[in-house]
Amino acid sequence: MKTSPHRNTSAIVDLKAIRNNIEKFKKHIHPNAEIWPAVKADAYGHGSVEVSKAVSDLVGGFCVSNLDEAIELRNHLVTKPILVLSGIVPEDVDIAAALNISLTAPSLEWLKLVVQEEAELSDLKIHIGVDSGMGRIGIRDVEEANQMIELADKYAINFEGIFTHFATADMADDTKFKDQQARFNKIMAGLSRKPKFVHSTNTAAALWHKEQVQAIERLGISMYGLNPSGKTLELPFEIEPALSLVSELTHIKKIAAGETVGYGATYETSEETWIGTVPIGYADGWTRQMQGFKVLVNGEFCEIVGRVCMDQMMIKLDKSYPLGTKVTLIGRDKTNEITTTDVADWRGTINYEVLCLLSDRIKRIYK
């Protein structure tokens, strides 16, 4: 989707806030651990290239979801190590090797397909993925891990790392977390040899399970200033949200009592009402679920009325405002604030999803 620079709807990204959040984490974790930020999904909607360049001096490497995300960083001269967390097709391992991109090896079957490729494998770096209870990708027993190590050694593949991912580190009940921890430790104890990087700590584990001492801390949502648990667990230190979402009023009118607003005529005025139109809609990631939620105009909460359209939405105003008046969808205006987590709670989802759904059509402004 093409960015719309001539449309005054913007995501404002505070790169200093992201740097400050990383600095706070560096003080919180083990001094020997490297932070590898997750900049997948366009850095959770913040802009992967811009974020990576802004924090490169603070981190050991970066984590992305797929090979294309890694290639994008390399194409923009990001030189730090990069780990692809998802599996890739074996036919593309030569690209990763040539660009010094480390890959997740999710299974022995996958690695067998890799060595069948007519590619130079001596520059290939792999991190064996361990499924300790997430049920997503990775091996589940030490025998398979050791067979993978043996196969990697045979073909001069660099067994650089091994890792797992916790499913419930952001929950108050740590029963599942401890079970996963025990499963991962059991596999580690039976490995034929240890790699350079052993890592299992995601953002939530770094925040609430400091007993985990890892070579790499995979820092995600809290780097961008959000609590991975939503509002369930209290953060051990303050972090600053890095993204605000703003737009403006493009049309204002007073309509009579009994008039309807939007598709389906789902909102009817009970009295004369000022209605403002805002250029953002579900094609921008501001979903139809937002009907009935609030935005901020001049520091005051204003209700979203009628169904959110593809490109625009309507809000109920307390009075007339000039065209171009700022509308805050996420962020602070005077004494009031709307957080990403507030939006997520209204939608019945998580703050991660709210950020990741903000489409490329919304221009990003960096400060």
From Swiss-Prot:
CDD domains reported for this sequence: PLPDE_III_AR
List of residues that carry N6-(pyridoxal phosphate)lysine: 40
Picking any one GO molecular function of the record gives: alanine racemase activity
Q: What EC number(s) are associated with this protein in UniProt?
A: 5.1.1.1
Instruction: Indicate what this protein is called per its UniProt record.
Output: Alanine racemase
**Catalytic activities:** L-alanine = D-alanine
Which pathway does UniProt place it in?
Amino-acid biosynthesis; D-alanine biosynthesis; D-alanine from L-alanine: step 1/1
Q: Where does substrate bind?
A: 136, 310
Signal sequence bounds: none
Q: Which SMART domains match?
A: Ala_racemase_C
Q: Which top-level enzyme class is recorded in the Swiss-Prot or TrEMBL entry?
A: isomerase
Q: Which GO terms describe its cellular component?
A: cytosol
What does the sequence similarity comment in the record state about its family?
A: Belongs to the alanine racemase family.
What function does the entry list? Catalyzes the interconversion of L-alanine and D-alanine. May also act on other amino acids.
**Keywords noted in UniProt:** Isomerase, Pyridoxal phosphate
Organism, as annotated: Lactococcus lactis subsp. lactis (strain IL1403)
GO BP annotations of the record are:
D-alanine biosynthetic process; peptidoglycan biosynthetic process
Q: Does the keyword Cytoplasm apply?
A: no
Annotated Pfam families: Ala_racemase_C (PF00842), Ala_racemase_N (PF01168)
> Which positions are catalytic residues?
40 (proton acceptor), 263 (proton acceptor)
Q: Which cofactor does it need?
A: pyridoxal 5'-phosphate
